[in-house]
Each structure stands twice: as structure tokens, then as C-alpha cells.
């Protein structure tokens, strides 16, 4: 009488029939003599070590969680506790339906024989759920591919926060010694996306913490990077974003106005210091008089210059409200102000 098949953590025989399992403990001989796909002996190995004669490529095993260690180069540093609790509940009810991916550690003296390549969150949840063994695909992965594979899994699962993703990109650039274009081609992302994400690492540390915690979005962070006043101003605006609930669009407008005001003040400051001699614009009789009349009309500084082929009028304003006031004056009929071409 055939013995009933043993339940394999929610996976049954489906996955084991597709992925080689390698020789079981106590078996000898080359891998070509091991159990074949679909045979009655092609079962999973419960916590058995990987022999030196394992089948090349990926093999399927069920491994005790204690025999596995986390990936030290895991790009994701923040694990959502609520989502992890939901996964624990699901594993207790249905088992772990998707295996993790690990690589074998040769010569380990601590009892840990495998290292996670993909699936640290599932491994953590399986431990908390109390599983004796968890399904795993043992794959040969070199050190140079360990970070890349972990990064790609997290990107595809949308589990990295912007700062973790940026740090992982920078680490890949440093370790591979490649350009942004080459990295983009390797991991299937666009070069502008990689460049913009890495720029987030230039933010002040307190602002980075807000982004990592999800309090500020990547859009907010990119807007803050455009603030020219420096780190202190970026931290101050970040606090204001959180306190007032500013949208990304509102943040961008605030940064634009702040930069304009800083440039205006710098312009006035430069006006008090002697500037190097430069070519003077062509002057015509009455041109300065027109500039003064416009300045009086708009109650702001106005400069009028004339080049060889065309002239230019510059009307300065101090704020958005000031601009609206000036535009309102411009829409009125200027003939009563005596601004005729004959005045030139």
C-alpha cells in the first residue's frame, strides 16, 4: 500500500518536480546518478547539507530557518512591521507558498550553511510563524551578484524606500566601477531615474530620515534638493512640509520663490560692490528719462537698454503679489502717462 505523501509547506510536489533537488543525505555517487525529475525518490531534503557533488545550478530544498543567515548586503533596512505581521498570519494558515532563494556557505563553523539572496522578509516571517523548515531554492550566486540580485528583487516588489534604493545604486556604482548608463543597462532602469535617486543622498541626514520613514516622498526630496539656500533651509522647509502637509507642487513653488528672493538679494548686494568694467549699452537721449518714468509708474526699478539691433526693458518685482500688481498696471492705457515714442 502506498504511503500518503507528506505535505511540503504549502508547495506540495509542484515546485520540487520542476527544480532539481540534488542527492539526499547518505547517498553517494555523481549527480547524474541521483534521483530524476518525477521519480518517487525525487523528494525534498529536510535540512540536509549540500554535498560537494550537488547538481549544478538551482536545486530545491526545505531548510531549517536556523541554518540560514540574512544577506549582509541587503539594500532594504526598514521592514514594515504591519505587513510582516500579515505575512506571518498567512504563513501560519497556508504555509510559505513562495520559496526563498539562498546560496550555500562553504566551510561555515557556526552551523549556518546558507545565506539569503532573495526573500529575507519571508524568512523573517517564517521564523516568527514557527515553521520547522522553509522551502528554498539553493543557487550558485557570487559575491559580485549578491547585492544586485537582492536589489532587483526589492525593486520589482516595490519594497525599498527611496533612500535605500539610492544607497543600493551608489553601492553598485562603487563596487562595479561602472557609469550610470552602464548600471542602468545592467539592472533595467533608466539612467535619469538612477541619477535622480542617487542625488537624494546629498540631502541633510535629518531630511533623509524623514524620507526613509515615508514622511516625505521622493518628490518632496527632489524639490528640497533644488533649494539653493543650503542644508539648514532644506531642514526647515522639510519640517514645514510635514507640519502643513504641503504637496509636492506647493513645495516646488515655495522653493522657486525662495531661490528667486535669494537671487534678488544677492543682486542688490552685488550692486554695492564695484563690478569689473563691461561694455556699456548704447545710450540715446531721453532713454534714461523713460526708465525713470517707468520706475515711477510701476513703483519698482526699471532699466532700459538698447543694443545694435534691439532694445530691452527690465522690470523688477519682489514677490508674486508685486508681480500681479505690476501686470495690473501694465494692462491700463499707458498713453495718459506720457510714454510715447516721441519722448525718446
UniProtKB/Swiss-Prot annotation:
Q: Where is the signal peptide?
A: none
Q: What does this protein do?
A: Involved in chromosome partition. Localize to both poles of the predivisional cell following completion of DNA replication. Binds to the DNA origin of replication.
Q: What is the lineage of its organism?
A: Bacteria, Bacillati, Actinomycetota, Actinomycetes, Mycobacteriales
Q: Can you cite an annotated GO cellular component?
A: chromosome
GO biological process terms, semicolon-separated = chromosome segregation; positive regulation of sporulation resulting in formation of a cellular spore
Give me the ranges of the annotated region Disordered: 1-33, 259-283
The record, for SMART domains, names:
ParB (SM00470)
Query: According to its UniProt record, which protein family does this protein belong to?
Result: Belongs to the ParB family.
Question: What domain of life does the native source organism fall in?
Answer: Bacteria
The encoding gene is parB
Give additional notes from the record: Was identified as a high-confidence drug target.
Which molecular function terms from Gene Ontology are attached? DNA binding
> Could you tell me where the Basic residues compositional bias lies?
1-10
Which keywords does UniProt give here?
Answer: Chromosome partition, DNA-binding
The record lists the organism as: Mycobacterium tuberculosis (strain ATCC 25618 / H37Rv)
- Which Pfam families does this UniProt record tie to the protein? HTH_ParB, ParB_dimer, ParBc
Q: Where is the composition biased (Basic and acidic residues)?
A: 261-270
Which protein are we looking at?
Answer: Probable chromosome-partitioning protein ParB
Which InterPro entries does the record match to this protein?
A: Chromosome_partition/occlusion (IPR050336), HTH_ParB/Spo0J (IPR041468), ParB/RepB/Spo0J (IPR004437), ParB/Sulfiredoxin_dom (IPR003115), ParB/Sulfiredoxin_sf (IPR036086), ParB_dimer_C (IPR057240)
Amino acid at each position: 500500500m502506498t504511503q500518503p505523501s507528506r505535505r511540503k509547506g504549502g508547495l506540495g510536489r509542484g515546485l520540487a518536480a520542476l527544480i532539481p533537488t540534488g542527492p539526499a543525505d547518505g547517498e553517494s555517487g555523481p549527480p547524474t546518478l541521483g534521483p530524476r525529475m518525477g521519480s518517487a525518490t525525487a523528494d525534498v531534503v529536510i535540512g540536509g547539507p549540500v554535498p560537494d557533488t550537488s547538481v549544478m545550478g538551482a536545486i530545491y530544498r526545505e531548510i531549517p530557518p536556523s541554518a540560514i543567515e540574512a544577506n549582509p548586503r541587503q539594500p532594504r533596512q526598514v521592514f514594515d512591521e504591519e505587513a510582516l505581521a500579515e505575512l506571518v498570519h498567512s504563513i501560519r494558515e497556508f504555509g510559505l507558498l513562495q520559496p526563498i532563494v539562498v546560496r550555500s556557505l562553504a566551510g561555515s563553523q557556526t552551523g549556518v550553511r546558507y545565506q539569503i539572496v532573495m526573500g529575507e522578509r519571508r524568512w523573517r516571517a517564517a521564523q516568527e510563524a514557527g515553521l520547522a523548515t522553509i522551502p528554498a531554492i539553493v543557487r550558485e550566486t557570487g559575491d559580485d551578484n549578491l547585492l544586485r540580485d537582492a536589489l532587483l528583487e526589492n525593486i520589482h516588489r516595490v519594497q525599498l524606500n527611496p533612500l535605500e534604493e539610492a544607497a543600493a545604486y551608489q553601492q553598485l556604482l562603487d563596487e562595479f566601477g561602472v557609469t550610470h548608463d552602464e548600471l542602468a543597462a545592467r539592472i533595467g532602469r533608466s539612467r535619469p531615474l538612477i541619477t535622480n535617486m542617487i542625488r537624494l543622498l546629498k540631502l541633510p541626514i535629518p531630511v533623509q530620515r524623514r524620507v526613509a520613514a515615508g514622511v516625505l516622498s521622493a518628490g518632496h526630496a527632489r524639490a528640497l534638493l533644488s533649494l539653493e539656500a543650503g542644508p539648514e533651509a532644506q531642514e526647515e522647509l522639510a519640517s514645514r512640509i510635514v507640519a502643513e502637509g504641503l504637496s509636492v507642487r506647493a513645495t516646488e513653488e515655495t522653493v522657486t520663490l525662495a531661490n528667486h528672493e535669494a537671487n534678488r538679494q544677492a543682486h542688490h548686494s552685488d550692486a554695492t560692490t564695484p563690478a569689473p568694467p563691461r561694455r556699456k549699452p548704447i545710450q540715446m537721449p531721453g532713454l534714461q528719462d523713460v526708465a525713470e518714468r517707468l520706475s515711477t509708474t510701476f513703483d519698482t526699478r526699471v532699466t532700459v537698454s538698447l543694443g545694435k539691433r534691439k532694445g530691452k526693458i527690465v522690470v523688477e518685482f519682489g514677490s508674486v503679489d508685486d508681480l500681479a500688481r505690476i501686470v495690473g498696471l501694465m494692462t491700463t492705457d499707458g498713453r495718459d502717462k506720457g510714454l510715447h515714442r516721441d519722448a525718446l
